[in-house]
């Protein structure tokens, strides 16, 4: 989802954060996949996964119990700066665990609730980068835009991703190496090997995954051309 995708309800920012987590870790959503357009993916995910009872984070944990677990929420305290430092520290301490991710809960200057999926902790610059649905311009916690918006972090909601469909080499990324392993039939876990979620492990999984990898590469190249940042 991006800024052109309308929020379905008043918890739109939480929906965005959970949908982005679903995309990032390739969680199954019936009727859509990583090649679907953002609007269709977002609306399908929200209506399919977040339409039950209980909190939305618990609904995600229940729906994807075969792939992840929700860990205990960490509630923060202190000043705005102290809370930002605490959030960074929690994420930095887990930065070596590629399957660990978190959603930050916060309030804004207007008093509204806001949720953001953390992208990664840069331990060199000591910055916590964000995937924020609220603005194109927010990059990391504590930057000028987050201060302008008055972000006040109240909690860190961690998830531990245990399995990622299509990720055969266990690095929690979908790459050409995973495609090669699928083509070589090196399948250790059918749940991981079933990249296209059709309940069958076959060549179609490798074909789908190859399309995803190519699309991701093309998108990264496009972003690099727009920002002059080289593709890693």
Short names for language-model regions:
Residues 10, 14-22, 57-61, 84, ...:
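Extracytoplasmic/secreted envelope proteins and their assembly/folding machinery
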Residues 1-2, 163-173:
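Boundary/junction segments of secreted and surface-exposed precursor proteins
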Residues 97, 121-163:
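Noncatalytic regulatory segments and standalone regulatory/sensor domains
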Residues 77-133:
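Active-site-adjacent substructure of cysteine-protease-like catalytic cores
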Residues 16-19, 168-190, 198-231:
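Alpha-helical segments with a strong preference for the paired helices of cellulosomal dockerin domains
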């Amino acid at each position: 989802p991006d800024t052109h995708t309308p929020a379905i309800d008043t918890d739109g920012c939480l929906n965005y954060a959970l949908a982005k987590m679903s995309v990032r870790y390739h969680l199954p959503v019936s009727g859509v996949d990583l090649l679907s357009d953002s609007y269709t993916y977002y609306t399908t995910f929200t209506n399919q996964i977040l339409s039950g009872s209980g909190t939305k984070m618990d609904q995600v944990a229940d729906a994807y119990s075969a792939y992840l677990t929700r860990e205990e929420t960490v509630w923060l305290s202190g000043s705005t700066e102290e809370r930002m430092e605490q959030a960074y520290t929690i994420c930095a301490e887990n930065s070596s665990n590629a399957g660990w991710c978190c959603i930050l809960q916060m309030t804004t200057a207007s008093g509204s609730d806001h949720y953001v999926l953390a992208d990664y902790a840069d331990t060199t610059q000591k910055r916590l980068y964000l995937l924020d649905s609220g603005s194109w311009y927010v990059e990391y916690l504590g930057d000028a835009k987050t201060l302008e918006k008055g972000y006040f972090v109240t909690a860190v909601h961690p998830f531990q991703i245990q399995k990622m469909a299509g990720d055969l080499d266990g690095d929690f990324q979908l790459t050409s190496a995973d495609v090669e392993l699928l083509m070589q039939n090196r399948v250790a876990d059918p749940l991981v090997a079933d990249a296209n979620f059709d309940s069958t492990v076959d060549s179609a999984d490798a074909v789908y995954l190859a399309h995803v990898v190519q699309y991701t590469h093309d998108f990264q190249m496009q972003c690099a051309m727009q920002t002059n940042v080289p593709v890693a």
